[in-house]
């Protein structure tokens, strides 16, 4: 797991530990999922870790919440606290999960009620809650201006996802079983610079202890640039592509390719300025291959509980009541 989480250019759906790879993607094609973008999985990647010294690890990346704009405030793109996000591993080749990592998210306001500012004339002020994610600059060394935070816990389920034995994943970096998710990228005034945000976000990479595993893994959940490449508008406009290469070779600039063709360019990628929310796990190979042949299959799912009752007088943490059995609403592998 590279500390900057740079992605391979080829989308990888299933990774064998011998590097046999295939590709897949989903960007909101299922009609019902458009009503719940927070549980919409856009891509799933699995590959051998390529950071120096990490050759004995596999990285699994599940991306959620498609088509995020950097200016998508004031609420930005929180994960759904009523959902169950899962990464499943099949290490016996029977298309049934043997290991599942379940993620549950929680939200909180600063001090329980959020930051309040005194509004009004002197002697007649009223404390008014601020409806913003932050009220000042944010950095690794000073997060006092953060007004909204997300945390998450992880459970490892062995066997059947719904009925198997579950154990908490331990946070080796800071202790306990809770992990923090950084704010989305709000802007350079908030974080000082692009580099300032990178430093801030990287501080949320955690070492994790896996039950029964001699080596630690790592986890990271945060907003990242969407690594997928596609011309979405032309695709859904009756596959309205012009010939891709207008030159005899990419970059030749001689116009001797397809008549009316275009030179390959990142400007044709309509996701180049879009973000997603990444759930990334880096796991020791020895602890996930089981007794199979050393090859794994993997997928991600998101589930919601069946009954939901909306609160007619909602508060921050009580907008609805959820209960009952979990139902899979999103799947990608």
Q: Where on the chain are the PLM-derived regions?
A:
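Surface-exposed extracytoplasmic segments
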Residues: 23-333
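Gram-negative bacterial Sec-dependent N-terminal signal peptides
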Residues: 2-23
């Amino acid at each position: 797991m590279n500390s900057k989480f740079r992605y391979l250019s080829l989308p990888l759906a299933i990774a064998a530990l011998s590097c046999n790879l295939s590709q897949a993607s989903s960007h909101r094609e299922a009609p019902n999922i458009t009503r719940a973008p927070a549980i919409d999985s856009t891509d799933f990647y699995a590959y051998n870790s390529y950071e120096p010294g990490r050759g004995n690890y596999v990285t699994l990346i599940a991306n959620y919440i498609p088509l995020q704009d950097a200016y998508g405030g004031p609420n930005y793109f929180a994960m759904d606290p009523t959902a169950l996000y899962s990464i499943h591993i099949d290490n016996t080749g029977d298309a049934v999960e043997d290991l599942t990592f379940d993620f549950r998210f929680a939200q909180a306001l600063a001090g329980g009620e959020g930051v309040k500012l005194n509004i009004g004339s002197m002697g007649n002020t009223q404390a008014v809650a601020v409806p913003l994610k932050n009220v000042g600059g944010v950095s690794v060394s000073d997060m006092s201006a953060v007004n909204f935070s997300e945390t998450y816990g992880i459970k490892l389920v062995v066997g059947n996802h719904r009925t198997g034995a579950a154990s908490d994943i331990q946070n080796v970096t800071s202790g306990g079983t809770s992990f923090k998710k950084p704010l989305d990228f709000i802007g350079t005034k908030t974080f000082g610079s692009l580099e300032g945000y990178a430093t801030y976000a990287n501080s949320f990479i955690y070492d994790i202890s896996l039950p029964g595993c001699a080596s630690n893994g790592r986890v990271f959940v945060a907003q990242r640039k969407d690594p997928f490449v596609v011309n979405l508008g032309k695709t859904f406009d009756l596959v309205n592509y012009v010939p891709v290469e207008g030159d005899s070779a990419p970059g030749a600039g001689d116009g001797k390719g397809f008549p009316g063709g275009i030179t390959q360019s990142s400007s044709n990628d309509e996701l180049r300025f879009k973000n997603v929310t990444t759930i990334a796990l880096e796991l020791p190979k020895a602890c996930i291959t089981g007794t199979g042949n050393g090859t794994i299959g993997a997928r991600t799912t998101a589930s919601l509980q069946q009954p939901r009752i909306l609160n007619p007088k909602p508060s921050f943490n009580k907008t609805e009541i959820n209960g009952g059995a979990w139902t899979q609403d999103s799947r990608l592998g």
